[in-house]
Swiss-Prot record:
Name by which UniProt lists this protein: Putative zinc metalloprotease XF_1047
InterPro entries linked to this entry: PDZ (IPR001478), PDZ_6 (IPR041489), PDZ_sf (IPR036034), Pept_M50_Zn (IPR004387), Peptidase_M50 (IPR008915)
The enzyme's E.C. designation: 3.4.24.-
Membrane-crossing residue ranges in chain numbering: 98-120, 371-393, 418-440
Cofactor(s) needed by this chain: Zn(2+)
Pfam families xref list: PDZ_6, Peptidase_M50
PROSITE patterns listed in its UniProt record: PDZ, ZINC_PROTEASE
Domain of life: Bacteria
UniProt keyword terms in alphabetical order: Cell inner membrane, Cell membrane, Hydrolase, Membrane, Metal-binding, Metalloprotease, Protease, Transmembrane, Transmembrane helix, Zinc
Residues reported in the UniProt entry to bind Zn(2+): 22, 26
Annotated source species: Xylella fastidiosa (strain 9a5c)
Length: 444
C-alpha cells in the first residue's frame, strides 16, 4: 500500500513540474506577442487555489493534477470588447500563433536539456555494463564473465542501462551489434553479437537475457527467507542462510537455484547444497520432492541477495556539461523517434506504449534509486511530452500547427466546420491511444 501512494505522489510531482513548464511556454510567448491570458491553470476541475495578477490573468491550481491549460482571449470563444480586440489570440498573425503554440513543446525540450545538464553536473549513480555470465549468443560471440562493455556500434556506454537500451534497439532493427569490451585484466577486444539470429517475435523487454547476457550486479546468491513446514529443508536450512552452490555449480540468483533444483530432481539423486550461515560455510545433502504440479521443490522461499553498491558515476564541470546536455538531448530525441517509428512499422510491439499506471510506478522506482535517477526520468518524460504534443493530431499542439501550416499555404484559415471535424478525429485518435496505454498498463 505504501508503494501505491508513493507512486501516485511521484506521478503528481512529475506531471506538475512538466505541465507547469509546458504551459508557461505558451503563457510567456503569448504575453510577448501581446495576447491577453485569461487563465493559467495547472490541473483541472475545482480550483484549490487561485490568484489574479495585475495583468488580469487568473493563476489556478486545479483539483485533478493530470494536465493544465492556458486560456487566452479569443473572439471565437466569447465576445471581446473593441478596446481589447488587438489582444485577442485570433487577431494575431499566423507566425505569432505558431510561436505561441510551439512554445509549449519547446519549453519541455528546454526543460529536458536543463535537467540533463543538472544530471551531468551532479552525476547519476548506476552499475557498469559488466557481464556476470555469458550464454547463448553472447558466449558464441566470445564474451566472457568479467568483460565490461564500453561501446556498442561506436556509441560509448557507461552503464548497463545504456547497454541494454542500445542492444534492444539493434535487436528490434534486426541488426547485429559490434561490442567493444575491456576484460577483467584490462585486455581490449571487439565482438559481433549476432542479434539477427534472435527468434522472432521476441519480448523487447528482455533482450539482454535472450542473447545470454546477465549483468554482474544482478547476480547475487539468494537468501533463504522462509522454510515450509514439513519440507525436506526443515531442520537443515534456516532463514538467513545464503545459498552458494548446488552440486558444485555456483548459485548466482534465485533463477539459478530454481533451475538447479529442477535438474537435481530430474537426475533422481541427492544433491550437495552449499550455504553460508553467518561466518560458517556448510554442505547439506538434500533430495528435492516433486509437487502435484510436477515441480521439484526443497521447500524454501528466497529473496534476492543484497544489492551491491553502485560502481558507475560520471560528473562534469558546469561549463563542460552544457554541450553534453545538448548532445544527449539530441540522442534521446533520435532514440524516441526511432522507437515510435518501430512501433508504427511493426518492428516493435505496441506493448511499449505506457500509460499513467506504468509512469507512476517508474516515477516511484526512479525516486527510490536517488535524485539522479529521478532527474533522468523527468528528462525522458519531458522529452516524450514535447514529442507527443507535436504529433499532427487536432487537439494537440501539433494539430494546431498543422492548421496554421495549411492557412499559410492557402492564404486563409480553415473553415470552422473543417476544424471541428478535425477535433473529433483528434479526440478519437487520442482516446484510442490512451485506451491502448491503459490496456498495456493493466496487462503489465
Amino acid at each position: 500500500m505504501g508503494d501505491f501512494f508513493a507512486s501516485i505522489w511521484w506521478m503528481i510531482v512529475s506531471f506538475s513540474v512538466l505541465v507547469t513548464f509546458h504551459e508557461f511556454g505558451h503563457y510567456w510567448v503569448a504575453r510577448r506577442c501581446g495576447v491577453k491570458v485569461l487563465r493559467f491553470s495547472i490541473g483541472f476541475g475545482t480550483p484549490l487555489w487561485s490568484r489574479r495578477s495585475s495583468s488580469g490573468t487568473e493563476f489556478v491550481i486545479g483539483a485533478i493534477p493530470l494536465g493544465g491549460y492556458v486560456k487566452m482571449l479569443d473572439e471565437r470563444e466569447a465576445d471581446v470588447t473593441v478596446a481589447e480586440r488587438n489582444q485577442a489570440f485570433n487577431r494575431k498573425s499566423v507566425w505569432q500563433r505558431i510561436a505561441i503554440v510551439a512554445a509549449g513543446p519547446l519549453a519541455n525540450l528546454l526543460l529536458c536539456m536543463l535537467l540533463l545538464w543538472v544530471l551531468f553536473v551532479i552525476g547519476k549513480q548506476d552499475y557498469s555494463a559488466t557481464v556476470g555470465r555469458a550464454e547463448h549468443l553472447a558466449a558464441q560471440a566470445g564474451i566472457h564473465p568479467g568483460d565490461r562493455i564500453t561501446a556498442i556500434d561506436g556509441r560509448q556506454v557507461t552503464s548497463w542501462s545504456e547497454a541494454s537500451m542500445l542492444l534492444t534497439a539493434a535487436a528490434m532493427d534486426r541488426q547485429n551489434a559490434v561490442l567493444r569490451v575491456i576484460g577483467p585484466y584490462g585486455e581490449r577486444s571487439e565482438h559481433t553479437l549476432e542479434l539477427s539470429k534472435l527468434k522472432q517475435p521476441f519480448d523487447e523487454r528482455h533482450v539482454t537475457a535472450l542473447v545470454g547476457i546477465n549483468w554482474q550486479f544482478m547476480l547475487q546468491p539468494p537468501i533463504i527467507a522462509k522454510i515450509e513446514p514439513g519440507s525436506i529443508a526443515e531442520g537443515a536450512i534456516k532463514p538467513g542462510d545464503i545459498v552458494l552452490a548446488v552440486d558444485g555449480q555456483q548459485t548466482l540468483s534465485t533463477e539459478d537455484l530454481y533451475n538447479q533444483i529442477q535438474k537435481l530432481g530430474r537426475d533422481g539423486h541427492p544433491g550437495m547444497i552449499e550455504i553460508r550461515r553467518g561466518e560458517e560455510r556448510l554442505a547439506l545433502e538434500l533430495s528435492p520432492r516433486k509437487s502435484a504440479q510436477g515441480v521439484w521443490l526443497l521447500g524454501v522461499k528466497t529473496n534476492p541477495g543484497p544489492v551491491p553498491a553502485f560502481d558507475s558515476q560520471q560528473r562534469y564541470g558546469v561549463l563542460a556539461a552544457v554541450p553534453l546536455a545538448i548532445r544527449e538531448t539530441g540522442r534521446m530525441t533520435a532514440d524516441s523517434l526511432g522507437m515510435m517509428k518501430r512501433i508504427i512499422t511493426g518492428q516493435a510491439s505496441a506493448k511499449n506504449i505506457s500509460g499513467p499506471i506504468s509512469i507512476a510506478k517508474i516515477a516511484n522506482a526512479s525516486a527510490k534509486r536517488g535524485v539522479g535517477w529521478f532527474i533522468y526520468f523527468l528528462s525522458l518524460l519531458s522529452l516524450s511530452l514535447a514529442i507527443i504534443n507535436l504529433f499532427p493530431i487536432p487537439i494537440l499542439d501539433g494539430g494546431h500547427l498543422l492548421y496554421y501550416a495549411i492557412e499559410l499555404l492557402k492564404g486563409s484559415p480553415l473553415s470552422t466546420r473543417a476544424m471541428a471535424a478535425g477535433q473529433y478525429i483528434g479526440l478519437a485518435l487520442l482516446a484510442g491511444l490512451m485506451g491502448l496505454a491503459f490496456y498495456n498498463d493493466l496487462l503489465g
